[in-house]
Structure formats: structure tokens, C-alpha cells
Amino acid sequence: MSNMKAEQQYIDLFAQCEDLVCRHSTPVMNALRAEALANFERLGFPSTRSEDYKYTDVAQAFAPDYGLNINRVAIPVNPYDVFRCDVPNLSTSLYFVVNDTFYDKDLPKAHLPEGVYAGGLKAFTEQYPEIASKYYGKAAPSSKDGIIALNTMLAQDGFVVYVPKNVVVERPIQLVNIFRNDVDTMANRRVLVIMEPHSEAKLLVCDHSIDDVKFLATQVVEIFAEEGARFDYYDLEESSVSTTRFSSVHVRQAASANVLVNGITLTNGLTRNNYYVELNGEYAESTLCGMSVLDKEQQMDTYSHITHAVPNCTSNELFKNVLNDHAVGVFSGRILVKEDAQKTAAYQTNRNLCATREARMYSKPQLEIYADDVKCSHGMTTGQLDENALFYMQSRGIPRDEARMLLSVAFTSDVIDHVRLEALKDRLHKLVEKRFRGELAKCAGCRICK
């Protein structure tokens, strides 16, 4: 790639390597590439002139020269040999994506019920092309924005969770995304979750960057929860200050489906998280949470859009950020209640702490309501730690730095309290405390991070 216009270098790359991209993928994924290319040429990267991307220069993030593993060259490491996610009292079915390739060698026994699929997207589309075609790219069409179009154009693999009707997966499924390379690297990841009626599962995704080079990730997550399904999606980002991530999570819920999405960022460089939730069946319930702890010049940009399309649905949204040094936080959240969506209950809250004068937080909560029989609210506050509380704690013999840490931990605790896995909840509380103490560079439970 060269220093030409950011979009053009990817268009030229695809023109040169389209055959290789398709050869190392499958017909289901390849069928969407031409349309994705056309949409990317039309849309380009979102501009800071757009209100939704006002504080994040996307084109600048994509402009540098990143390497892509289009030939799917194997990474000479077995992550099962070097990686251990040590959460006490939590047993998971563990899988890995290295850069953007599902690691399909030496897979351990999955402990999954009959009919459940957890594994590579490429393999899933080959084994179950009809199911894959029904869902892949449907919640996140490439016409939605230029980053999704780019991802759809270039993605060759990813991860799938498929749970048949009436099946309950008791053991959580864990996916670890590992960035590892000797050169600056770009990865285009996909996650597809298909929950058939009255099924249940939980997915924990952990992002790690191992090496000191620059990494750039685009990630598109599509979650389909059919009638009565129950699904939890936990996204823990512990990458590095040289990692940039653009993630879009798209959730479609049918009647009585219950979906929890909780994103926690403890270490990053620049992160943009988009969340799109569609409540398309009555009595569907959505819980959308997130928090970040930022310092140095880290940036977290969160955008959410929840659509209430039918009556009697509930959504609860809570995002919090703690910013130190010159960190930047952005939150833009919109709840759309359509005319037919009577008896809607929708609540949105954004709370932020700026621990230094140099830290910046931009927040824009929004309600767009076309129904008249609803219960909706939104609220935003940005401030600093309570000096009276700090003074009181110091008067009781608690050092000021310790008092600041304890108040910061308490501020973020309600986001973690939404986690519906007790062992994971306990570990996250401890990780957040370590982060505030400055003791956490990466998850201490991982051999590869020690």
C-alpha cells in the first residue's frame, strides 16, 4: 500500500488480489464481495464531517501501510500450548482466532451438546451453506457504512456459534482473538451467532495484542436471537496502545428473545464500538452495557442505535468511562421508538469521570419517539471525583491515591454487575481494580501475557 487516498489503496489491493481472497474463502462469503466493493467505492470511510464520527478520523487510522494475510499463511504457534485464561471456577469451551484466521488444529474436546456448532466461519459456510447464506451479512449489510463494506470485501474467516432449537449450552464458549506478527498487521474478523428458538448460550470474546508492532482490526458481529432465545455476549478488550479496532455489533431479536451485550475495555489504543439492536418481536428484552478505563492518549468512541419496532419490548442501556491523562471518550446513543411500538420501556444512561483537566469526554444521548404510550428516559453526566468523598476517606486514614482508586472502582462496578456469570464477574472486578492501581498491563491469567 502507498500513501494515496486511504480508500483507494484498499480498492486497488482488492483488484490485485481478488482471486486470492476468494480462493482462500468460500462461495457464501465470496457472493457478497462485489456488492461490498461497490458500496465501499460509494461510501468510502466515514468522515469527521458526519455527526456520528465527528471525533474519530477513520481515514487517518486506515491510511498507514498494514500487511494482510490474504494467502492465509499459518502462524507458527499453537495458542493452546502458550495461552491459558485462568478465571477461577469458570470452565469454557475455548477457541482461538490468530489475527483473522480461525485456529483449527489440535482442537480440544468442546463439551458442546449435540447439534451445537462453535468454530470457524469458513468451515461452517462449507458444511452448512444454506444456513450460512440465510444469516451471513443480513444484520450487517455492506450498504450500512464503509467500514462494514471493507470488512465484507476482505474477510476470509471468522467464528460461528450455532445453537439449535431448545438446546441449552451450559458451559460458556470463549473466543480469544490474538494479534501476533513481526510487521504492522490488519485483520478483518467476523463473528456470526445463530440462536434458534428457545436456545441458550453465552460467548466471551477476549482481544489481545502480543507483539509491539501496530495492529488494525475491523470486526463485524452479527447476532440473531430467534423466539425465546437467550444469549450473552461479553467483549473484553485488553490489547495495546498500538492497536486500533473498529467493531460493529448487530443484534436482531425476535419475540421474547433476551440478549445481553457487555463490552469492557481495559487496554487499547483507539477503539470505535458500534452497537445496533433491533427489537422485532414483542416482549423482547435487550441489555446493552459498556465501560472503559482510559489513560495516556487512548480513545474510546461508542455509538449505539436501538430500534423498538414492535410493542411491549424493553431496552436498558448503560455506558461508563473513566478518563485520565489526555484520554478522549465519545458516546453517541440513539433510541428509536417506532409508531407501532406502544408499551415500550427504554432507558439510556451515560456516566463519565474525567480524572484530569486534560481528559475530554463528548456525549450525545438521543431519543426519537413516535409512539405515545411509552416509558423512556435518557441521561448523561460528566464530572470529576467527589472531593468531599475523597476528603472524608482521607480523614479516615485512607491515602488519597487509594481513595481515588476505590471511588473509581465503585463508579464502574454496576456495569460489571450486569455480567450473568459469577466467576467472570468476580474476575472482572479484580481486573478493573488492578487497572486502576496501574498493576495491569495485560490479563495476568494468560501465560502468553506474563
Predicted features, each with a name:
Residues 2-149, 318, 324:
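N-terminal amphipathic, basic helical "cap/leader" segment at the start of enzyme domains
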Residues 114-117, 121, 127, 131-398, ...:
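Conserved beta-strand/loop scaffold segments within soluble protein domains that form the structured core
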